């Protein structure tokens, strides 16, 4: 049955004449005011290529909604560009922006009594932020990803932004010249759109499809593709059907839908940030999802997609062979997906995949069969142990290391760790510990890409890293993040000392500090938290409200 509309209570009837007067001021006619009023929430910013073009996409989405008999009004949300903030105070605002985006969409939607929602995003936190709002609002909603950039090239090598970060380390280690670094910088990201590898933005775009919240095939076309425009228009049109049939976001965002998304994440070897974001979206949808669900699904799901940074290909390559539905179909045929879940098409996942038009081209070089995987286990593993009682995350798709034991080299900030790598303090065989970079400690749980890229770029191939911060989706190597509890709240990572032995054991799903329980307890008794880095402003407010990484680092009422 049709969804109950919000807009009549705000815009119909004698007493709402002042409200209608304002709608007339922006060009709506009597006929348009009488139609369902829908929001186009657009994460738009000129501060970077990821969301530079989304305002234009919003205009296309409006055309699609009008074709479906709806009256659209667009509004922007904020965007924090992760790459520009990387390695600076700006990165502390990245994860914060996810929850701010969710709050902004909620506020705009409810304040203006919209009936349905189209969300358009690009950079890392925009997709989960908008999906969190959709889950929270529980209204007819559909998402469209803005698309990735085309890859760059230099000296016959295909480039992504990951190569620029690692080139800095290579230059500092005198492995390349300054001119080579400059040429890589100029060529790595040649168009509008998000980072081209399967980093966080493309991972979350893929998750929007796997959750059933986006049209099949819509995540993979590049930002510059004409098919991107087509998908945006069709997304706008599809909202009309959702409203007509009364399909709301929580009808789609079920526990089974999240299992499908986690399965897809594991099969594609996507970003560890997706663990945080899926937990957060599930929280807003009222779905009980835990880190244990990720490991349970990881064990049964093979890693089959050779996507950068763990593999060889970028999103544009996946698009050429059929996009995310190619991965989903292989998983469905292997009995690894719930085919009966509802999606934004009004059809089930199985129906979508049966009706999707797959290109008649080879794809096994990018997406393998489930019976011939790259690795038998999914691309992400959750570790627990004496160093991470509530959990930590490692991306095994981006490393072949299954066990690492080494002496700790401890730093209390990302900046100190970066200087340590630069100055040669970090030696082969060591485990770099970066703490007080968690949700409350940093605050904002920044990504450690500057440090991990410096390690890789310097040729330190036998160094691991453990942090209560996050990693960029571009990170590769034996890097463990999201350690919970974090140092700021007295997690065991707070009492690690230089020279302590750290054990990372993927097969046993363990992350341990090789000390006796008694010694750990004694050190924790002697520990006291440092003063907060921020005592006022947004980051101080965020630190007071945010939960631990093991719970999705969502902000909750105090």
Swiss-Prot record:
It catalyses: (2R)-2,3-dihydroxy-3-methylbutanoate = 3-methyl-2-oxobutanoate + H2O; (2R,3R)-2,3-dihydroxy-3-methylpentanoate = (S)-3-methyl-2-oxopentanoate + H2O. GO terms for molecular function: 2 iron, 2 sulfur cluster binding; dihydroxy-acid dehydratase activity; magnesium ion binding. SUPFAM superfamilies: IlvD/EDD N-terminal domain-like, LeuD/IlvD-like. InterPro entries: DHAD_IlvD/Edd, Dihydro-acid_dehy_C, DihydroxyA_deHydtase, DiOHA_6PGluconate_deHydtase_CS, ILV_EDD_C, ILV_EDD_N, IlvD/EDD_N. Its EC number is 4.2.1.9. The keyword Transmembrane does not apply. Its cofactor is [2Fe-2S] cluster; Mg(2+). HAMAP family: IlvD. This is Dihydroxy-acid dehydratase. The lineage of its organism: Archaea, Thermoproteota, Thermoprotei, Sulfolobales, Sulfolobaceae.
């Amino acid at each position: 049955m049709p969804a109950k509309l919000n807009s009549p209570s705000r815009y119909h009837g004698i007493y709402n004449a002042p409200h209608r007067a304002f709608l007339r001021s922006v060009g709506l006619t009597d006929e348009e005011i009488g139609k369902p009023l829908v929001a186009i929430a657009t994460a738009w910013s000129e501060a970077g290529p990821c969301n530079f073009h989304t305002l234009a996409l919003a205009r296309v989405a409006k055309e699609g909604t009008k074709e479906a008999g709806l009256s659209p009004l667009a509004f922007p949300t904020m965007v924090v560009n992760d790459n520009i903030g990387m390695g600076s105070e700006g990165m502390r605002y990245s994860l914060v922006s996810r929850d701010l985006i969710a709050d902004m969409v909620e506020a705009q939607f409810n304040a203006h009594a919209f009936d349905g929602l189209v969300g358009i995003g690009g950079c890392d936190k925009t997709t989960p932020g908008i999906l969190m709002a959709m889950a929270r609002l529980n209204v007819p909603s559909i998402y469209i990803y803005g698309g990735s950039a085309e890859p760059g090239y230099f000296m016959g090598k295909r480039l992504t932004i990951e190569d620029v970060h690692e080139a800095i380390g290579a230059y500092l280690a005198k492995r390349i010249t300054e001119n080579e670094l400059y040429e890589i910088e100029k060529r790595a990201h040649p168009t509008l759109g998000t980072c081209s590898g399967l980093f966080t933005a493309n991972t979350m775009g893929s998750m929007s499809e796997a959750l059933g919240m986006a049209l099949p095939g819509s995540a993979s076309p590049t930002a510059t593709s004409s098919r991107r425009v087509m998908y945006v228009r069709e997304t706008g049109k599809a909202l009309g059907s959702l409203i007509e049939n009364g399909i709301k976001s929580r009808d789609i965002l079920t526990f089974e839908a999240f299992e499908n998304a986690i399965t897809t994440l594991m099969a594609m070897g996507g970003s560890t940030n997706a663990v945080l974001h899926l937990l957060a979206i599930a929280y807003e949808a009222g779905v009980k999802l835990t880190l244990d669900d990720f490991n349970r699904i990881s064990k049964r799901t093979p890693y089959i997609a050779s996507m950068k940074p763990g593999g060889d290909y970028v999103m544009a390559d996946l698009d050429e062979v059929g996009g995310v539905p190619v991965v989903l179909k292989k998983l469905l045929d292997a009995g690894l997906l719930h085919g009966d879940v509802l999606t934004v098409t009004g059809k089930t996942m199985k129906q979508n995949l049966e009706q999707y038009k797959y290109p008649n081209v080879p794809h096994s070089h990018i997406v393998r069969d489930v019976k011939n995987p790259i690795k038998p286990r999914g691309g992400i593993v959750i570790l627990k142990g004496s160093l991470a009682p509530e959990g930590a995350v490692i991306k095994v798709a981006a490393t072949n290391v299954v066990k690492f034991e080494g002496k700790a080299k401890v730093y209390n900030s990302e900046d100190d760790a970066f200087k340590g790598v630069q100055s040669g303090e970090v030696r082969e065989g060591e485990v770099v510990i970066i703490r007080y970079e968690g949700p409350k400690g940093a605050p904002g749980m920044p990504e450690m890409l500057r440090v991990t890229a410096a390690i890789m770029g310097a040729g330190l191939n036998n160094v691991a890293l453990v942090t209560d911060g996050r990693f960029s989706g571009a990170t590769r190597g034996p890097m463990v993040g999201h350690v919970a509890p974090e140092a700021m709240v007295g997690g065991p990572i707070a009492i690690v000392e230089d020279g302590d032995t750290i054990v990372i054991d993927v097969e046993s799903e363990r992350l341990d500090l090789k000390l006796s329980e008694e010694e750990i307890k004694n050190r924790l008794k002697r520990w006291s938290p440092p003063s907060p880095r921020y005592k006022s402003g947004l980051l101080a407010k965020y630190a007071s409200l945010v939960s631990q990484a093991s719970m999705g680092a969502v902000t909750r009422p105090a």
